[in-house]
């Protein structure tokens, strides 16, 4: 089950009470005070675990509390510190108190102190004085801290796939990565985000995210895509997946509508570096002309390159995809325009190298 938002209550432990006791030994008639200090309450930490990508483990478990400190003992023995509470979350988890962002947990194995446990109380040995040799008072431990927080997950990926329902995003991510999403010939097959690791060679790999298809009005709450757009906010490069075989909606119109929804949702997201993938090109007769025309629409000059082992008749890429792959000075210009077929794996091998270059 994929869960990306949950409310929980976290609490640190209470400090243990100090001890009231007096030294009692043979031949010692009136021993002095020897009550030990109470142990500090346990702390609460958030720890990032790279092996999980959902908050589902928090469903049904609302309270997360550290242990209380133990009471002080006799003979000046201090009480044991309360056991800490380690709350494990996936990378990309944000912790909110009300509407205010409190913690942003990104790095794997990162551990952040959230709440400090209450201080243990002092034993009566601390209160002996010249005028009070037999103090019968010890401090209580301080209370712990409790907070109601909201966990929001924003998946961390290098490449984010954006497209309309049934554009072939799930097929693509299953073809070039280790992800195994549900694939079927109907809209909204993808109901939750999918993450996949794309291995380019023995030394290089990157993470790709596929979210449910976006429809017109998604930024206003229609469809499924809007609730998951936040999962591509952290991506470095967006890849628009367009269905080149659609007769009712051409690739230019698909692109314009997708970009409009992104701009409405988040200008920052819309301004990310991006490329365009013309999917299902194996069933389009005039794919070369279509690609040239689309490049002209983006004010790009289509160019045939063999640097990435492209299929000979599908080698149209942005000129920036040269060996040095310099950054495009125009942030709104596509880094690449690549025709491919996720079903027949046409140009998908080359796509891995294209995306890796884009990330560099």
Curated annotation (Swiss-Prot):
Main EC class the enzyme belongs to: hydrolase
Obg domain sequence ranges: 1-156
Keyword field: Cytoplasm, GTP-binding, Hydrolase, Magnesium, Metal-binding, Nucleotide-binding
SUPFAM superfamilies registered for this protein in UniProt: Obg GTP-binding protein N-terminal domain (SSF82051), P-loop containing nucleoside triphosphate hydrolases (SSF52540)
PROSITE patterns, alphabetized: G_OBG, GTP1_OBG, OBG
Domain OBG-type G positions: 157-360
Annotated positions binding GTP: 163-170, 188-192, 210-213, 279-282, 341-343
Keyword Transit peptide: no
EC number(s) given by UniProt: 3.6.5.-
Residues involved in Mg(2+) binding: 170, 190
A molecular function GO annotation: GTPase activity
UniProt keyword Cytoplasm present: yes
Gene3D superfamilies: GTP1/OBG domain, P-loop containing nucleotide triphosphate hydrolases
GO biological process, one term: ribosome biogenesis
Family matches, as InterPro entries: G_OBG, GTP-bd, GTP-bd_Obg/CgtA, GTP1-OBG_CS, GTP1_OBG_dom, GTP1_OBG_dom_sf, OBG_GTPase, P-loop_NTPase
Main location: cytoplasm
Gene Ontology CC terms: cytoplasm
Cofactor annotation: Mg(2+)
Coiled-coil region(s): none
Pfam families cross-referenced by the UniProt entry: GTP1_OBG, MMR_HSR1
Compartment(s): Cytoplasm
Quaternary structure and partners: Monomer.
Protein role: An essential GTPase which binds GTP, GDP and possibly (p)ppGpp with moderate affinity, with high nucleotide exchange rates and a fairly low GTP hydrolysis rate. Plays a role in control of the cell cycle, stress response, ribosome biogenesis and in those bacteria that undergo differentiation, in morphogenesis control.
Family, as annotated: Belongs to the TRAFAC class OBG-HflX-like GTPase superfamily. OBG GTPase family.
Name of the protein in its database record: GTPase Obg
Source organism phylogeny: Bacteria, Pseudomonadati, Campylobacterota, Epsilonproteobacteria, Campylobacterales
């Amino acid at each position: 089950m994929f869960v990306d938002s949950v409310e929980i209550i976290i609490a640190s432990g209470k400090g243990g009470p100090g001890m009231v006791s007096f030294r009692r030994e043979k031949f010692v008639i009136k021993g002095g005070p020897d009550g030990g200090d109470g142990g500090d309450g346990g702390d609460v930490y958030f720890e990032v675990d790279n092996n999980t990508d959902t908050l589902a483990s928090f469903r049904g478990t609302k309270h997360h509390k550290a242990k209380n400190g133990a009471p002080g003992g006799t003979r000046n023995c201090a009480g044991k510190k309360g056991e800490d509470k380690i709350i494990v979350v996936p990378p990309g988890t944000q912790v909110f108190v009300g509407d205010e962002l409190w913690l942003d947990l990104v790095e794997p194995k990162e551990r952040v102190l959230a709440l400090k446990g209450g201080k243990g109380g002092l034993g009566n040995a601390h209160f002996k004085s010249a005028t009070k040799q037999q103090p019968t008072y010890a401090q209580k431990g301080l209370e712990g801290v409790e907070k109601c927080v909201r966990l929001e997950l924003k998946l961390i990926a290098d490449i984010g796939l954006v497209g309309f329902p049934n554009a072939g995003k799930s097929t693509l991510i299953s073809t070039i990565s280790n992800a195994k999403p549900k694939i079927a010939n109907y809209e909204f097959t993808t109901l939750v985000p999918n993450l996949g690791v794309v291995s380019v060679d023995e030394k290089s790999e990157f993470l790709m995210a596929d979210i449910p298809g976006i429809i017109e009005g998604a930024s206003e709450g229609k469809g499924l895509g809007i609730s998951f757009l936040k999962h591509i906010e952290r991506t470095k490069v967006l890849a628009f997946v367009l269905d080149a075989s659609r007769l009712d909606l051409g690739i230019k119109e698909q692109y314009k509508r997708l970009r409009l929804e992104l701009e409405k949702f988040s200008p920052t997201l819309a301004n990310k570096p991006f490329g365009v993938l013309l999917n299902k090109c194996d069933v389009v007769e005039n794919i070369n002309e279509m690609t040239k025309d689309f490049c002209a629409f983006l004010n790009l000059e289509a160019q045939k390159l063999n640097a990435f082992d492209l299929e000979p008749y599908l080698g149209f890429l942005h000129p920036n995809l040269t060996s040095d792959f310099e950054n495009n000075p125009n942030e709104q210009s596509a880094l690449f325009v690549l025709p491919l077929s996720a079903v027949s794996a046409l140009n998908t091998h080359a796509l891995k190298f294209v995306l890796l270059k884009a990330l560099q």
